[in-house]
Amino acid sequence: MLLKNCKILKNTKFEKVDILIRDNKIEKISENIDITDENIIDIKNRFVTAGFIDVHVHWREPGFSKKETVYTASRAAARGGFTTVMTMPNLNPVPDSVETLNKQLEIIKKDSVIRAIPYGAITKEEYGRELSDMEAIASNVFAFTDDGRGVQSANVMYEAMLMGAKLNKAIVAHCEDNSLIRGGAMHEGKRSAELGIKGIPSICESTQIVRDVLLAEAANCHYHVCHISAKESVRAVREGKKNGIKVTCEVTPHHLLSCDEDIKEDNGMWKMNPPLRSREDRNALIVGILDGTIDIIATDHAPHTMEEKIRGIEKSSFGIVGSETAFAQLYTKFVKTDIFSLEMLVKLMSENVAKIFDLPYGKLEENSFADIVVIDLEKEITINPNNFLSKGKNTPYINEKINGIPVLTISNGKIAYIDKEEINL
């Protein structure tokens, strides 16, 4: 496959090149590659970069295929420019043993159009009491997490970190102290009071991060914080890094894009976990990106049925979809307004992910895996969930206009998504 007339970023400047793909690798990147026997695709001077890597998606299968399937989720991710994703273990059965993990791996092998690497659960059934069969499943999982809930026992988390260090696997944490949730459904603040909805305080997240950073130091383990949302959490991670502790973290697009003030009414589409916090918290997240405290962006793509999201904030399920719109929303909100550079954004979604988790992906260079996304930076669409490839339509960003639309995604040398109106084969 030969991609002609590509525009790539090199040393902060655009260069026009051709990219030759053979098998699953990038064989050559050069001006004017002239090979006639290849499948030639004219990219028409669109932006080309390494495929995005998302370390936080809920693909819902096995167990919850009413919400999403591997088939639909992988195509949605490819449409958003993702070529590698890591799937969360809050499934049925939970991947906490070789047998249960294999059920998920079989579905991925059969139905996914992109590279998908499962997480293993930290604890059996994600109950937080007894460690899963971590040693037995380590070779086939990306890392370990009980995402969807916090590990409440410090001792269980410490034992998990000791095992993670032994296996050279990260411990990835959804940080939430159950004793501080107090029946809340959105951020505890002025807006929750105005809407008459019980709130979840920021300390519900940040206190568990502080605990875990110290445990990670004691265990000498790579500790990664999921979907950071509060200013105190950013501070805790920043201090951990300053002290040489192996702590990294991610932020979601929606926590960068919005805050609780954007919730104008009691609408379950705005319910997510962690919740959208204050304007001050959102600003702290942006500063955390700019100063390097926050390492990467991950979507926390969490599809639900419409029935689960139309019950108001208190009774709806937590979660928002993001695979198909993440890059475009961030490009529109932050790159077009000169808050982030284009180079910074693509690194946050690809190269940085590969770097902190030591992955052989996230590079657009010769001999690297042919994981590529072609983006039309000028193309504008209006977000319409009815057009999503995901089964999940649960987004509050309906009718938002966005630029920077992926039109071709190649994962491991194979076309995973193509906009046939924009790209001619």
Swiss-Prot record:
Q: Which cofactor does this sequence's record say it needs? A: Zn(2+)
Q: Where does Zn(2+) 1 bind?
A: 56, 58, 147, 300
Cofactor descriptive note: Binds 2 Zn(2+) ions per subunit.
Transmembrane segments in this chain: where? none
Q: Which residues bind Zn(2+) 2?
A: 147, 174, 227
GO cellular component annotations of the record: cytoplasm
Family, per entry: Belongs to the metallo-dependent hydrolases superfamily. DHOase family. Class I DHOase subfamily.
Protein name per Swiss-Prot or TrEMBL:
Dihydroorotase
Organism name: Fusobacterium nucleatum subsp. nucleatum (strain ATCC 25586 / DSM 15643 / BCRC 10681 / CIP 101130 / JCM 8532 / KCTC 2640 / LMG 13131 / VPI 4355)
Q: Which gene encodes it?
A: pyrC
